[in-house]
Design a protein with these regions (language model features):
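Deubiquitinase catalytic domains
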Residues: 70-167
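Papain-like cysteine protease catalytic cores
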Residues: 1-111
Length: 167
């Protein structure tokens, strides 16, 4: 597994949606979005996620907290925090796998704690980092290495490039 780097995401209640939108851009080979573009993409994704809940009501209503209509109405608000149900719906809206990572004590890289949208493949997922307290950041593979590992970096970069091109 490639080392991962975190891209700091603004904590404005949209962090989950910003992180997923950021990761989707990177996965598609686009440039990392600016803060203002992140906000716009996050709000668009949030609206589509709320619509996806309604579309999949029979499958989702049972695992949402409280009244379904109230929950969806709350999720449409720009500062409502998202969690596992929203990550699942993000994977459906985007048609992409999403992995949630979290650092554990003494680990160099965060470990995967949840996976969504595996029906869309397992290669090159959108990666988000959960801090354990409600905030999400975007994660992306880091191709930077020390001088001692440059040869391996070239190999990994070559492999990573072609695995992304095939996706």
């Amino acid at each position: 597994m490639l080392p991962l780097t975190s891209s700091g995401i603004t904590g404005d209640g949209r962090c989950l949606f910003r992180s997923v939108a950021y990761g989707a851009c990177i996965r598609r080979g686009k440039q990392s979005p600016s803060d203002s573009v992140q906000k716009e993409l996050a709000d668009e994704l949030r609206a589509k996620v709320a619509d996806e809940f309604i579309k999949r009501r029979g499958d989702t209503e049972w695992f949402l907290e409280g009244n379904f209509e109230s929950y969806v109405r709350k999720m449409r608000k720009p500062h409502a925090w998202g969690g596992e149900p929203e990550l699942l719906m993000c994977s459906h809206v985007l048609g992409m796998p999403i992995t949630v990572h979290m650092y554990t004590k003494g680990a160099d890289n965060p470990r995967i704690i949840a996976e969504y949208g595996q029906e869309y493949g397992k290669d090159n997922p959108v990666r988000v980092l959960y801090d354990g307290y409600g905030h999400y950041d975007a994660l992306q593979p880091s191709l930077e290495r020390s001088v001692a590992n440059r040869r391996m970096t070239r190999y990994v970069s070559f492999f990573y490039y072609f695995s992304r091109a095939a996706a």
